[in-house]
């Protein structure tokens, strides 16, 4: 009978210690316990404090993590956030999901003349390259139209206007990674400017590929005879009417010995670009346009002339993750918002709600998650390594695991890991998304270890020097250790 009072006390103390063990403060303290010594050494060598690092490693099929270090601290994940966006889209929209770009007539067609306007209805296609836009234009020509008597009306209301400016992130609006999503985004709104020395005429020939009909290029580049010393540094590219204007100005000097020079530039506004390239291709295909371009909405009585289907979502997420395409990730993100509220222009708010709802359905609470645009090109996005690992584990258990895994860069093989983890035994054994921004270096994905076991591995470093070497050094040490488990 002397046992009776002890048992409740024992149970109570066990319960209390369990409660403490699971309380956030205690979990964080326990989190900091263990890091593989190789990782600690890498941190010391790189002069990075433990407080700036989070690591989570767990074998698939096991409940307990192998490493859980600062695992609930919200971090900026940079482009590893694309893991969350692409997996959510794959699971909620399905691998065969496609986007449609459609052309409509607002009047009758007589003798190949459209007596009215042509309405181009954007459907959010994340990968309408110049080749695919050419296919769209020629498909429309084959629908029996040669002349458009009226205007080309662009309806891009499938995505709500963002109100951001392209240079908002880093004041470099001409950089292609800054291109904003648009329901009718063609060729990522990007042209490649080419300069070729022509010694016969003593000039530098300049062109754009592709070349929208409404884009003017002022060429004031002077040719210097002789050897190449400065390369392309002598050429100054300016946008005199601002980053969204329809004019590019080239000035400076270029040496004949430098050969061809080319540089990609994001230019104009999305509808201007789509129209300019439509017009150029339409004319190349033998067509003419009577009017100009304006924005508008599709009239109810317009007649469908042609519909163009995008790549499948499984193909799209492969491009997003392998090459870290921001604009494609943002289109995926907004598409989830569009599907959440059919018939209403998609907003980032609806997209955030769609992702949060999807994760909650999968049992992933993610209270710390902050999604701004779904691409990771953000100073504000946040996630902790535990949530990131839970997303990867859900993807691993998913019926679409092969499609998701195949979308990630493969060590020493392709995408952003093409030149990393080149040790022969590691080639093709890691499928991981990279993330790099100022003060951020991150890696998240699957390590197929030498033992044949598979580990979900997430490492995020947020530190002033993170992207200048320390991040990759710490990742290398961690992955090497995981690979040996």
Can you say where each PLM-predicted feature lies in the sequence?
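Soluble periplasmic/extracytoplasmic beta-strand elements of cell-envelope proteins
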Residues: 54-58, 66-68, 85, 102-104, ...
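Short active-site loop at a secondary-structure junction
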Residues: 68-88
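Conserved serine DD-peptidase/penicillin-binding transpeptidase domain
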Residues: 28-43, 92-366, 473, 481-485
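Bacterial N-terminal signal peptides
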Residues: 10-22
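Positively charged n-region of N-terminal signal peptides that target proteins for export
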Residues: 3-9
């Amino acid at each position: 009978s002397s046992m009776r009072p002890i048992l409740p006390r024992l149970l109570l103390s066990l319960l209390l210690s369990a409660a403490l063990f699971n309380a956030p403060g205690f979990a964080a303290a326990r989190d900091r316990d263990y890091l593989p010594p190789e990782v600690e050494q890498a941190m010391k060598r790189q002069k990075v404090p433990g407080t700036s690092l989070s690591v989570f490693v767990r074998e698939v099929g096991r409940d307990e993590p192998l490493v859980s270090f600062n695992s609930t601290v919200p971090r900026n994940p940079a482009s590893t956030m694309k893991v969350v966006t692409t997996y959510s889209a794959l699971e909620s929209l399905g691998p065969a999901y496609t986007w449609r770009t459609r052309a409509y007539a607002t009047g009758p067609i007589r003798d190949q003349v459209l007596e009215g306007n042509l309405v181009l209805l954007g459907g959010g296609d994340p990968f309408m390259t110049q080749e695919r836009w050419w296919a769209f234009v020629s498909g429309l020509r084959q629908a029996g139209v040669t002349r458009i008597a009226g205007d080309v009306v662009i309806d891009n209301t499938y995505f709500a206007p963002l109100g951001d400016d392209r240079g908002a992130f880093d004041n470099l609006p001409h950089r292609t990674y800054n291109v904003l999503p648009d329901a009718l985004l063609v060729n990522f709104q990007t042209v490649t400017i080419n300069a070729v020395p022509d010694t016969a005429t003593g000039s530098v020939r300049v062109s754009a590929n592709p070349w929208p009909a409404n884009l003017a290029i002022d060429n004031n580049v002077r040719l210097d005879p002789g050897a190449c010393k400065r390369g392309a540094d002598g050429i100054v590219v300016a946008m005199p009417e601002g980053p969204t204007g329809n004019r590019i100005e080239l000035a400076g000097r270029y040496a004949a010995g430098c050969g061809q020079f080319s540089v990609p530039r994001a230019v104009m506004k999305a509808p201007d670009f789509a129209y300019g390239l439509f017009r150029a291709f339409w004319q190349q295909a033998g067509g003419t346009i009577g009017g100009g371009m304006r924005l508008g909405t599709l009239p109810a009585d317009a007649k469908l002339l042609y519909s163009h289907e995008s790549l499948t979502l499984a193909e799209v997420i492969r491009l997003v993750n392998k090459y870290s395409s921001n604009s494609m990730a943002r289109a995926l993100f907004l598409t989830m918002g569009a599907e959440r509220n059919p018939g209403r222009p998609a907003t980032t708010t609806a997209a955030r709600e769609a992702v949060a709802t999807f994760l909650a359905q999968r049992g992933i609470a993610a209270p710390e998650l902050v999604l701004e645009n779904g691409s990771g090109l953000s100073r504000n996005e946040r996630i902790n390594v535990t949530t990131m690992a839970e997303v990867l584990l859900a993807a691993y258990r998913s019926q679409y695991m092969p499609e998701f895994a195949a979308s990630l860069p493969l060590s020493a093989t392709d995408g952003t890991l093409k030149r990393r983890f080149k040790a022969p035994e590691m080639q093709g054994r890691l499928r991981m998304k990279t993330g790099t921004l100022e003060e951020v270096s991150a890696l998240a994905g699957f390590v197929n270890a030498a033992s044949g076991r598979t580990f979900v591995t997430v490492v995020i470093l947020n530190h002033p020097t993170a992207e200048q070497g320390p991040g990759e050094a710490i990742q290398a040490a961690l992955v090497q250790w995981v690979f040996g488990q």
